[in-house]
Every structure is written in C-alpha cells, then in structure tokens.
C-alpha cells in the first residue's frame, strides 16, 4: 500500500508526505 499524502506508519517509522495532495 502506498499512501502519498498525510502521515502514516510505514512499518518502522511515521512518514509524512504532501507529494500528491
């Protein structure tokens, strides 16, 4: 699952992205 907008857990850390909002 790829989530490209917002904050989510990628398995080892929180990732925050605004790359395709």
From Swiss-Prot:
Signal peptide: none annotated. It is found in: Secreted. Keywords: Acetylcholine receptor inhibiting toxin, Disulfide bond, Neurotoxin, Postsynaptic neurotoxin, Secreted, Toxin. One of its GO terms (molecular function) is acetylcholine receptor inhibitor activity. It comes from the Eukaryota. Its main location: secreted. Expressed by the salivary gland. This peptide is considered as a venom peptide. One of its GO terms (cellular component) is host cell postsynaptic membrane. Disulfide bonds join 4-20, 5-21, 7-16. The cysteine framework is III (CC-C-C-CC). This peptide has a cysteine scaffold similar to the M superfamily of conotoxins, but it displays a disulfide pattern previously unknown in native cone snail peptides. Injections of 20 uM of this synthetic peptide (Ile) causes partial paralysis to polychaete worms (Nereis virens), the natural prey of terebrid snails. This paralysis may be due to an inhibition of nicotinic receptors at the neuromuscular junction. This is Venom peptide Tv1.
């Amino acid at each position: 699952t790829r989530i490209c907008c917002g904050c989510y857990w990628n398995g080892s850390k929180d990732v925050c992205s605004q790359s395709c909002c």
